[in-house]
Amino acid sequence: MEIRTTEQFDKWFRKLRDRKAKAKISARLRQCEISDHITGDHHGIGGGISEMRFHFGPVYRIYYTIDNDVLVILLIGSSKDDQSRGITEARKLLALYRGE
C-alpha cells in the first residue's frame, strides 16, 4: 500500500514534540504499508474520509482517504482537543484533491 501525505499533514507531524508519539505513528504507518491494509483503530467518518486513532498522549487522529484501493492520502492530523477543526480541514483538503 502506498501512502502519500499532504503539506498540511507533514507540517502537523513536524510540529509534534512528543518523540514517542511520532515513533508510534511512524511505526503504524509503516505497518500499514507492509501489510497492505489499514491497521489498528480506524473508522469512516463520512464523505470518503476515515480516521486512524492513536490512544496515547492527547489521543491523536490522522484523517485519510483511500484512492483506487491502493493509495492512502494522509490529509491532516489532530488531537482529540481539535478534532472538529481537523475534520473540517480534512474535508477541504479532500475536495481540493478531487478537484471540487
Please name every model-derived segment.
Residues 1-59, 68-72, 79-100:
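Basic, Lys/Arg-enriched alpha-helical interface segments
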Residues 63:
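Short, surface-exposed charged micro-motifs
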